[in-house]
Amino acid sequence: MARFTLPRDIYHGKGCLEELKNLKGTKAVLVVGGGSMKRQGFLDKAINYLKEGGMEVQLIEGVEPDPSVETVMKGAKVMQEFQPDWIVAMGGGSPIDAAKAMWAFYEYPNTKFEDLITPFGFPELRQKAKFAAIPSTSGTATEVTAFSVITDYNTGIKYPLADFNITPDVAIVDPELVEGLPVKQVAYTGMDALTHAIEAYVSTLHCPYTDPLALQAIEMVLAYLPASYNKNMAAREQMHYAQCLAGMAFSNALLGIVHSMAHKTGAAFSTGHIPHGCANAIYLPYVIRYNAKNPAAAERYAEIARRMGLEGICQQALINSLCEKIDEFNVRLNIPKTLKDFGIQEVEFKEKVAKIAELAVGDACTGSNPRAIDPANMEKLLTCTYYGTEVDF
C-alpha cells in the first residue's frame, strides 16, 4: 500500500503571511535563522500576526545553515519550558528542518537523536503542538515535506530524518519573502528544486499522484529560474510555487543518489562546506548518466526531455539534451561543473572518497534510486564528479 501525504492547508500568494493570525492556540514558538527575516521586517510581522490571533510568542533565533544536533536540543529545551501548542518555523530550509526535529524532542524529551534516524520510525506527534512552516527560499520545500536534515558536526555527516509525522500542518508560501534573496541563493535553491522534481519523477516510488507535480515543477523551473536569478520578481513568485510543487512530489515519491551524495559530502571536506543546492547541481547530470543505464529510468529521463521540448531523435539523444540543459543552467548560474572546480583539494578527496561512498550508499535516499549502486560504483561516480570524467559504467 502506498501513501500520499501533504499539509492540511497550503496558503499561497503575496501577503498570505497574514494567515498566521488565524491559527487557533494560546502559545507559539517562532523559530528563525540568521537574521534576514528580522532585517526585512517579516519577523516583526509574523510576531504581530500571532499576537493578533491571541497567542503568546517565544522566539528561537539564530539557527545556523545546516543545523546541528546541538541547536536542535537547545531549541527543544526552550519548547519544553514554554509549552507551546503551535511551532511556527520561518526562513530557509535550516530553521524549518531544525524546528521539525525540535518538535519531536519537545513532545518526547527522553528520545535520543539516534532513535530518529530510522526512516519513518518517529513516534506520533501532535500530542502537544501543531506545526506551521513559512519558507523564505525557493528550493528545499521543507514546508510541505516529511523530511528534515540535521548535521552531526562531530562526524561531518548530514542525517536526513524522514517521517510523515513531521509533515507540517500548515504551509504559508508567500512570495514576498523571497524578493530579497541573494542571487547565489536563488541559483542554489533553484537547482535544488529541479533536482527534487527530477529525482521524484524517476524514483522507484513515483506514482500517478506525484508524476504531474514533478513534471509541472520541472517545467516551471526551466521557464523561470534564469529570470529569477536576474531579479525578475514575477519569476521569483513562480519559482516559489515551483519548488513547493517539487516538494509535494518528492515527499511522497522520495529521492535518489544525487541527494545521497550531497548529504554525505556537504560537510566532509576541510576546504569548506558545499551548499546543498550547489552539490545537487554538480552531481545531477552525472547521476542521470549513471541511472540512464537502467531502461526504465532512461525512458523517464527521455520523457522529461520530451515534455520540456528538448531536441533528440532517439532516447539517448533526449537524455543527452537533458544533461546538456542542466550543464547550461549551471554555467548561467555560475555553479562549478566539478568538485575540483569547487575547490576541494585532490589529496583530501582521494583520502576520503571511499568512506564517503560507503556512507552515501547507506543514505536514506539511496533506496528509491532507480538503479542500484554499491560502494565501488559510488566511489567511481564521485570520482567522475571530481574530475569531470565520463560516466561509462
What are these regions (language model features)?
Residues 147-253, 376:
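Carboxylate- and glycine-rich phosphate/diphosphate-binding segment that chelates Mg2+/Mn2+
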Residues 348-393:
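Short, amphipathic C-terminal "tail helix"
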Residues 204-213, 227-238, 253-258, 274-277, ...:
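Flexible, glycine/charged-enriched surface loops at secondary-structure junctions
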Residues 268-271, 277-351, 391-392:
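Gly/Pro-rich interdomain helix-loop hinge
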Residues 70-176:
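Glycine/threonine-rich beta-strand-loop-alpha-helix active-site module
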Residues 1-86, 339-340:
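ATP/NTP phosphate-donor binding region
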